[in-house]
Amino acid sequence: MKSMDKLTTGVAYGTSAGSAGYWFLQLLDKVTPSQWAAIGVLGSLVFGLLTYLTNLYFKIKEDKRKAARGE
């Protein structure tokens, strides 16, 4: 019975991956290269902003620790 459970789990994951791959390929066909370029530019700006905010968060946290220690 245990092997049947593993088999059905594998089939379910395989079906899910196949379905996700199909929809991903459909998305790739609908977006033009110029749209992908715009998505890339916007994505890089978003990741840059997230990096800046993460750095700012940790710098503030570090400053609070230094102030608590009296440095």
UniProtKB/Swiss-Prot annotation:
Lineage: Bacteria, Pseudomonadati, Pseudomonadota, Gammaproteobacteria, Enterobacterales
Species in which this protein is naturally found: Escherichia coli (strain K12)
InterPro entries for the chain: Lysis_S (IPR007054)
Isomerase found in the keyword field: no
GO MF term set: pore-forming activity
Keywords annotated in UniProt: Cytolysis, Host cell lysis by virus, Viral release from host cell
Note: Encoded by the cryptic lambdoid prophage DLP12.
Gene Ontology biological process terms in this record: viral release from host cell by cytolysis
Protein family (similarity comment): Belongs to the lambda phage S protein family.
Chloroplast is among the record's keywords: no
Protein name (database record): Prophage lysis protein S homolog EssD
